[in-house]
Amino acid sequence: MANTITYETLFEKDLQERLARPQNWREVCKVTMTNTRVINSQSISTAGDWAAVGTLTRGTAFDPTDVAEVADTLTISTGRHVTTYFDFGDLAQSPWTNEREIFSRAGERLGEFIETNVLAQHASWRNIGLVGGVWTDNNSTAGAASAANIDDLARLIRRVIREQNGASLMAKNGAFATVAPATFEFVEAFAQANGFGSADDALKDGLAPQVKYLGLTWYVSNDNASDHAMAGIRKVQRLGILQGTFGRMHKFPGIAGTSGGIQSGIAFHSRVDIGHLTPTDHANLVLDVNDTNS
């Protein structure tokens, strides 16, 4: 015997919450919002890394040190968009597809693009590699961060910054690392195994991303380039964003159809235009950690 049953269907009033990818670019980059295409920033260049100290003999002439200004250029020219089209009938009949939801998700996607694009600039940064199980400055050998070496990595990042004369800037802005979840797990394990009150807290609650530990602020990202993680001093890497397009939402009703007519619907459009710069004088203060966990 088999009955035929019609079951009640329940529809939730809201779309399922989107699983957003972490975004850290606002925290680690110096962000400039402008409608200017090209941004020039100057640095001073001399053979003596500023004005060289010379010998002075009383009553004897001396020569000054020549100083030259060097321009670093950031060009805002990389554009991306998120554009979706909906039929007017579908918009009227779907309680889930509304402008707030559409533009909110478009904004998240564009922010995720910026995150990925920032982390893709690793070729401009100073390398840290893993050689024979030891984190090594100015080396591009890839290796995996682990429970045995995560504290060594944190100490090396801070040491390299000091050796590159970035101690005062580190004290002002702070040092950071943007790592994969697998690497952050080892930071969490280290915190749970060391200390007293802090270890108890870490055992009870774990560590939340953007936590300061081992002298660094640790960020988590799922968008690091393969085998690369970003570290160094916060607000050194430059990011330019075109102010006139960022966060703007546009609606285009009745867009052209494939047959030459128009479609009975509306397109929702948002875009972002960006550019990057690793400043010449501070290039050694942004680090490419060659971590295979990424």
What is each stretch, according to the model?
Residues 3-9, 13-22, 26, 35-38, ...:
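Sequence/fold signature of self-assembling virion shell proteins
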Residues 128-205:
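Extended, solvent-exposed, turn-rich assembly/linker loops in the middle of proteins
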Residues 25, 48-53, 115-119:
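Intrinsically disordered or highly flexible coil/loop and linker segments, enriched in small
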Residues 88-163, 286-294:
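Alpha-helical scaffold segments that mediate packing/assembly in large oligomeric complexes
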Residues 58-104:
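Long, hydrophobic/aromatic-enriched structural stretches that serve as scaffold segments
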Residues 29-63:
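Long, acidic, intrinsically disordered low-complexity segments
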Residues 49-53, 94, 186-189, 277:
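Short helix/loop capping segments that flank catalytic or ligand/cofactor-binding pockets
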